[in-house]
Design a protein with these regions (language model features):
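Glycine-rich loop/linker segments at domain edges
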Residues: 15-22, 87-91, 95, 167-214, ...
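Thiamine diphosphate
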Residues: 256, 260-282, 286-288, 491-498
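Flexible, low-hydrophobicity surface segments
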Residues: 1-165, 270
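Short acidic, glycine/serine/threonine-rich loops at helix termini
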Residues: 82-87, 126-129, 236-238, 261-267, ...
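Phosphate/diphosphate-binding loops
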Residues: 118-119, 283-327, 539-560
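Helix-loop-helix junctions that connect adjacent transmembrane helices in secondary transporters/permeases
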Residues: 153-243, 404-477, 670-686
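C-terminal catalytic domains of large/alpha subunits in multi-subunit enzymes
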Residues: 66, 75-77, 244-251, 279-285, ...
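Extended active-site and interfacial segments that coordinate phosphate-rich ligands
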Residues: 12-19, 128-135, 230, 237, ...
Length: 750
């Protein structure tokens, strides 16, 4: 018998919320360690070349004599570091070349030295004195510059030179083919409707509020690392490989992460260097990246150039789809932005070709960013779908409905649960889509153009193995823990809800801890998988705790419930001190696997509808209204779910209208300006969920919700702007220069 107070599905407040709003929450840089020294990174200023050995030696000597300096770590004195195992570097944005391993420069912002001093001020002042000479080599900084040059490994060094290659799969996932083809192309001349266009997206920066920070402390041969990471288990493995020590001698702590969006999913080189520096000076060392260093040291979303070709019959039925992506990675790591993956599954198309080409250039290593692949890829696909609808003279929503895929087009599997048509219907009704005039420039308000646009949202449902530990305290309180992370997504709250409901306990008798590699292992917090992954482990642990407790109650002759029917036991009404009596039996660890994903395709879906106002006199586009309907399985906490989608949409608005990392063409240096949306840029939100549980992926019926809010947003904005202005814009971000009416000079010249 379960407790009557079901918590799953209710808007329970964040369990860590009070600490956050009162300033009591402690992030990595807030950790106070006795005897702390401070480190500052020195980075390279050219995209390709070699630092002269003599200049490094000279700079190190000068800086080493500066006030308060304890140590200067350079390629000339850095201990030899080990190599990462292949499974951590193949298709993951982990650099295979150890930091400070030589004097070769592969990109602007490569780590060149670490200056350690007694205070942060002394470290920063000394680091500013570290100047070197370069032997500059020709740099390749765009994908097109190396497009025809194959990227092959250098057998002697194991490094990769410039060039491009065709990756097979996205992060070793067999079902996510980056090169895919099916069916035969339509007969020439059969189909009258065509779209053949190129869409581009720029470099985007994650820009979390919290800067990446690391504190490394050695206690003999034991290493403790406090780091703003969302993969503590993977970081421990990578650190063990670099430092050539057993994993059980490393503990990684990351109790709270102040935003990540992909930037803190993997071990970045400054973490290793902080540990090396701490060992060198014999005291704890703190290293906090500057905002400028975040642009070059913790990944980014790489540029994409996407060619989309759609062919359809006169009634809008798609008969051929091609989506070709050109993107970039660094010369020292594998990563491909998988922009075409959603195209493989989203709409019916008898003939399909999807390809991805990745170019190795002199740039920092890119990595996952919220909605990797889907965010830029759906921009191209969903704008192309609108262009096709315009050519067919069919409402954009109607065209999507006509080409709706009832099964997974890539693998032929049935969907575990798909209610996209219901998302379309409910979203259109809530938005008032039936009143949309077909012709662009038909709507005006207060002297500005108004447009309505929409798009489809989708993101895979994922689950990986994870573990959970249960400890029953002396007062009967039950503590669940897993080596996952609270990154602002509310995972502690949701896991507490799952644990309480499954165990049959009041929520105030349950807690959930995360952020410690000493807890049972869990994967990185990303890919919208944490709730399904860790939630399954918590569910298994809580269910086992409940089974053990009931068995103890009815089997123990000293129990007041001895001999009772187990089905009638309401654990929530049992005195907590009774649970404490069985502490040893009720403290254990358990795990869950990745679930059965072989027979059905698991995918979340949604529909975005938006209204924009465009003032063509000043080139300003304002998004005024947004309706989103999401099909993401069971909603465990509607407040947190709404916040996730609302944040995701805002994230997508920045991608559509503001965000890009500008580079100086001559030096490849980022110019330091990065525009982000604020509260003033947010529209009126109407966000709803279908709340259809999907128990195929996991026992709690959820699918991922963290990325799907972003996916499709830039396309909906671009489609709405076209409806408002008649301008079809295919390059992100859409800027005021794109929207302004040219100013006419006297005499008619523009």
């Amino acid at each position: 018998m379960r407790t009557a107070s079901e918590r799953v599905g209710r808007p329970v407040s964040r369990v860590e919320g009070f600490d956050k709003v009162t300033g009591r929450a402690r992030y990595t840089a807030d950790v106070d360690v006795p005897g702390l020294a401070h480190a500052v990174l020195v980075q390279t200023e050219i995209p390709h070349g070699r630092v002269t050995e003599e200049s490094v030696r000279r700079a190190a000597e000068q800086v080493g004599s500066a006030s308060g300096v304890l140590h200067v770590l350079t390629p000339l004195n850095c201990p030899a570091l080990g190599q990462l195992p292949h499974e951590l570097t193949f298709d993951l944005p982990l650099e295979r070349r150890p930091p400070l391993s030589d004097l070769t420069v592969q990109h602007v912002g490569q780590h060149l030295a670490v200056v350690v001093a007694d205070t942060l001020e002394n470290a920063a002042a000394a680091a500013s004195l570290f100047t070197v000479d370069y032997d500059v080599l020709p740099a390749q900084t765009t994908a097109r510059a190396v497009l025809t040059e194959p990227a092959a490994p250098d057998e002697e060094s194991g490094r990769i030179r410039h060039g491009s290659y065709l990756p097979d799969h996205f992060v070793k996932l067999d079902e996510e083919k980056l090169q895919d083809r099916r069916g035969e192309p339509p007969e020439r001349g059969r189909s009258a409707l065509r779209v053949d266009a190129r869409y581009t997206t720029p470099v985007n920066a994650h820009y979390p509020i919290e800067l990446s920070a690391t504190i490394a402390e050695w206690n003999g041969e034991q290493l403790t690392v406090h780091d703003s990471t969302r993969w503590i288990a993977g970081e421990r493995t990578a650190l063990a490989a670099y430092l050539a020590i057993p994993e059980d001698r490393i503990r990684v702590l990351s109790p709270l992460v102040g935003g990540a969006f992909g930037s803190k999913s993997f071990l970045w080189m400054h973490v290793v260097l902080c540990a090396v520096a701490a060992r060198a000076v014999g005291r704890p060392v703190k290293l906090v990246l500057t905002r400028d260093q975040m642009f070059t040291s913790t990944g980014h979303r790489p540029r994409t150039e996407q060619d989309v070709r759609l062919i359809a019959d006169e009634d809008g039925t798609i008969v051929s789809t091609e989506h070709h992506t050109l993107t970039e990675t660094s010369t020292v790591a594998h990563f491909c932005e998988p922009a075409g993956l959603s195209t493989r599954i989203l709409y019916t198309s008898p003939h399909l070709v999807v390809s991805h080409r990745t170019a190795r250039i002199n740039a920092p290593t890119p990595c996952f960013m919220r909605g990797p692949g889907e965010a830029p890829g759906l921009f191209a696909l969903e704008v192309a779908i609108d262009e096709l609808a315009e050519r067919a003279r069919i409402d954009p929503l109607e065209l999507r409905i006509r080409n709706h895929a009832n099964a997974d087009q890539a693998g032929g599997k049935p969907w575990s649960g798909k209610h996209l048509l219901q998302c379309y219907q409910e979203g259109a009704e809530r938005f008032g889509w039936k009143d949309r005039p077909a012709a662009p420039r038909s709507l005006q308000r207060a002297g500005v153009q108004v447009g309505w646009g929409m798009s489809t949202a989708t993101y895979p449902g994922r689950r990986m193995p994870a573990g959970c530990r249960v400890v029953t305290d002396a007062d009967g309180h039950v503590e669940f823990s897993s080596a996952t992370h609270e990154v602002g997504n509310g995972v502690r709250t949701v896991m507490t809800q799952v644990a309480a409901d499954t165990a049959g306990l009041p929520i105030d008798r349950v807690s959930f801890l995360s952020g410690d590699s000493a807890f049972p292992a869990a994967p990185y917090s990303g890919a919208s998988q944490t709730t399904a992954t860790v939630g399954s482990a918590v569910f298994a642990a809580a269910d086992e705790w409940r089974r053990r407790f009931i068995a103890a109650l009815v089997d123990d002759a000293d129990s007041p419930l001895f001999g009772a029917d187990p089905a009638t036991v309401d654990i929530g009404t049992v005195d907590p001190r009774v649970a404490a009596a069985y502490r040893e039996r009720l403290s254990f660890s358990t795990s869950s696997d990745s679930g059965d994903q072989s027979t059905q395709a698991v995918q979340s879906f949604g529909a975005h509808f938006c209204e924009v106002e465009v003032d063509e006199q000043i080139g300003r586009a304002s998004v005024t209204r947004w309706v989103a309907v999401m099909d993401c399985g069971r909603v465990l906490n509607p407040t947190l779910a709404r916040n996730q989608v609302m944040g995701g949409i805002t994230f997508g608005l920045g991608m559509a209208l503001l965000e890009q990392v500008p580079y100086d063409d001559a030096t490849a240096l980022p110019l330091g300006e990065y525009y982000l949306p604020t509260h003033a840029d947010r529209p009126d939100f109407d966000i709803s969920f279908l709340d259809h549980p999907d128990f195929h992926l996991d026992p709690i019926g959820v699918r991922g919700i963290g990325e799907i809010g972003t996916c499709g947003v830039p396309a909906a904005v671009a489609n709405a702007i076209h409806h408002a202005t008649g301008k079809r814009l295919r390059d992100l971000p859409i800027t005021l220069e794109d929207l302004m009416i040219p100013f006419e000079q006297p005499g008619g010249a523009a």
